[in-house]
Amino acid sequence: MELKVFSNRAEASDAAAQFIAANVRSILTNASELLVAVPGGSTPRACLTLLGAQDLPWQNIAVTLTDERDVPRDHPDSNFGLLCDTLFAGQALMKRFVPLNEDAVSRTQHLPLVTLLGMGEDGHFASIFPDAAERDILLDAGAEHLLASVTTGSSPHPRFTLTMARLARAVAAGLLIFGDGKRSVLEVPGSLPVSHLVQAMDDRLTVFWAP
C-alpha cells in the first residue's frame, strides 16, 4: 500500500482521478477494453466529476459500481444516480454501464479492472461491512461469488456488492478517504474489512488522503 497525503480534499480528489485515468491509459495499450468500478457516497463526488472530464477512449471503458443499494435508480440513495450526476454528465458513456447483477458481472469478469474505492469510519469498503452476516464470503478472495447481497444493520436498505474475489483482481485500486478518523482506522492493523483489502491488494493499492 502507498499512502499519498494532500493538504486539501480537492487536491486528493484530483490526484485520485488522475491515478484512475493513468492506469486506464496504461492498460488500454495492451487490452481492447477494461472495466472501471467506482463507489457511491459523498466522498468520491468531486473525483468522479473530474474523472468524467478526462479525455479517455470511453467507448472502450465499461463502467460499474463497487456496490449499490437495492432501491430504484431514481431514488435519492441510489449510487447510479451519483454516476448520472458525475461520470455520465461528462464524457463517460452510459451505454457502457454494467449493472450489478449476476449475468452482467459474470460477462465482464475477464476484463482488466481498475477501481476507485471509499471507506467508512467503521472500516467498510464497497458494501463489505464489519457486521455483515456474509462477511466471511465477502472477504474471501478465493470465493466463487463475484457479487453478493449484503445483510447489515449499518444500512436502511438491502445492498449488493462486488466481493473481494472480484475487487482483489484489480490491476490497480485507489482508495480515497478524508479525515483523521478514517486515516487512523486505515493505519491500525486489525480485522476490519479495509485491513483485508490492504493485505489482498498490497502494492496495487494507493491511498489518497486529505484532512
PLM regions: where:
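N-terminal active-site beta-alpha-beta segment that forms phosphate/nucleotide-binding
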Residues: 2-105, 110
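Conserved phosphate- and dinucleotide-binding cores of soluble alpha/beta proteins
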Residues: 71-211
